[in-house]
Amino acid sequence: LDTFNWIVNAIVIAGVAYLAFAMALAGWIAGLRRGEAVTLLPARGDGAGTLAAQLGLVLASLVICAVLFYLLWIPLPLAVPPAAAPALAAGGLVIFVAGTLFIVWARRTLGRMWGISTSRQVKLLPDHQLIAGGPYALIRHPMYFGWWTALLGALVIYRTWILVFLLAMSLVVFYRRAR
């Protein structure tokens, strides 16, 4: 059981790390350098001040999230029979991986049309094209759906209050943003 839990945790951590860094932060920095991403602060000169300020904001947000995770990593009051725990973890892992793969599929389908908006307004590229293939043929906001699915999978695996909070908060925030 310990080896199985370790494998589940390793897959979840690797998936979260990939989504958080490779897709978001790396793409965001590349977009800022190309002048394609929306920024929180107006550009100054060559944009180095903006990039440094935004990276500072990202790092501060990560610290706040780490503190919240530490404080709210409280198990839900759900009794799971020890014999059912591996099946529940495996089911949660399948849901988590499906959500993660859906996000990756949606991101790859967007190609260069993808960018991270750090404001309430989405900045369209000059040669913007509506993407209607891949997962976008199935659902209007597949990256949001994939995120919710991955969070649901993590909730099934770990059953903690922080994941309930994140899922509820992201449902509200993404729903409002999508409208």
Model-based region annotation:
Residues 1-125, 129-132, 149-179:
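Membrane-anchoring alpha-helices and their flanking helix-loop junctions
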